Design a protein with these regions (language model features):
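Predominantly a core beta-strand signature of beta-propeller blades
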Residues: 24-25, 65-67, 105-107, 167-171, ...
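Short loop/turn segments immediately following beta-strands, especially the blade-tip
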Residues: 210-217, 297-304
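Beta-propeller blade signature
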Residues: 104, 151-165, 207-212
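A short loop-to-beta-strand structural motif that recurs across blades of beta-propeller domains
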Residues: 56-58, 96-98, 158-160, 207-209, ...
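Blade/loop signatures of beta-propeller domains
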Residues: 1-26, 54, 303-305
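Beta-rich, blade/repeat-based domains predominating
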Residues: 22-24, 30-45, 72-91, 96, ...
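Beta-propeller domains
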Residues: 17, 42-71
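Structural recognition of the beta-propeller blade-terminating site
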Residues: 51, 60-61, 100-101, 163, ...
Length: 305
């Protein structure tokens, strides 16, 4: 049932324990064209996110508001932090995954697989063993809007793992149509990956899949975790109890570890991605089309640097 003037919709009573009845949706920034890739820097007390078509990474701080963190971001999309706290970014224009070093220099983590250029890396996570996992759909090479139109060199749209010791890149899943957001369960025994192919083909997949992680390197037992009925799934994050908070066209939907839809936070724009942040990691930051929003929730995001 709707709550708080329509902010929440509850589909399972378990959602009541996750929402805060007096919380409201705060708009923190606007003026983007397609806002994506939020990542919280707890040590700096700020949020970074991508504005893909405007080719920039923006920063929001509670004290000072919005500023440009990086112009000419190579149409950056997904962002995360590695275990040393460094920014790891997916770039559409250059078709690569990069790391920003403490001195501001850029290190290329991955730009080719078997000698061929990647499509347009979309989203990325870093496991506790320092391995880097990312998705590589073709959105950034389909048009000039969020990258540069180009021929696809890879034979498909894959999910990759970068070995932390050798830098070797390996395909871990090869049967997605358009792999997109991804996140590990709190214990890292499951990797969740969205397939957002329904954005361009109504008959294509529009769901989030789950895979068991074997030996920290391989994925097995792939299955559909949940089907998204309100647009396509894009980016998502996990809370400490294993609930999955995903972007949809209607807002942010929360799914229990058993795959049940618990509830929805309604957002007035199409949501692309989310992340937990704030001093207690209980504030959900939401990148949605032209804007950055935030809402307090009664849970905590999985701890990251």
């Amino acid at each position: 049932m709707p709550a708080n003037d329509g902010l929440y919709e509850t589909f399972d009573k378990r959602f009541h324990s996750l929402m805060i009845g007096i919380a409201h949706l705060d708009k923190l920034a606007d003026g983007c064209v397609w806002a994506e890739g939020p990542v919280w820097f707890a040590d700096g007390g700020y949020l970074l996110w991508s504005d893909i078509p405007n080719n920039r990474i923006l920063r929001w701080m509670p004290e000072t508001g919005v500023s440009v963190f990086r112009a000419d971001s190579n149409n950056s999309n997904g962002n995360t932090r590695d275990r040393q706290g460094r920014l790891v970014t997916c770039e559409h224009l250059t078709r690569r995954v990069t790391r920003t070093e403490p001195d501001g220099s850029i290190t290329v983590i991955a730009d080719r697989y078997q000698g061929k250029r990647l499509n347009s890396p979309n989203d990325v996570v870093v496991k506790s063993d320092h391995s880097i996992w990312f998705t590589d759909p073709s959105y950034g090479i389909l048009t000039e809007f969020e990258g540069s139109r180009a021929e696809q060199e890879q034979g498909g749209c894959y999910v990759y793992r970068v070995d932390p010791a050798t830098g070797e890149i390996a395909v871990v899943v090869d049967d997605f149509v358009k792999p997109n957001g991804l996140a590990f369960s709190p214990d890292e025994k499951i990797l969740y990956v969205a397939d957002s192919a329904g954005s361009h083909d109504p008959e294509a997949p529009c769901h989030i899949r789950a895979f068991d992680v074997v030996d920290g390197k391989r994925l097995v037992n792939g299955r559909v975790f949940c089907n998204i009925k309100t647009g396509v799934p894009d980016g998502f994050r996990m809370d400490v109890n294993g609930n999955l908070w995903t972007s949809t066209h209607a807002g942010v939907e929360c799914y229990a570890p058993d795959g049940a839809l618990l509830g929805r936070i309604n957002v007035p724009e199409i949501v692309a991605n989310v992340c937990f942040g704030g001093t207690r990691r209980n504030r959900l930051f939401i990148t949605a089309t032209t804007s950055l929003y935030a809402v307090y929730v009664n849970t905590t995001g999985v701890q990251r640097p």
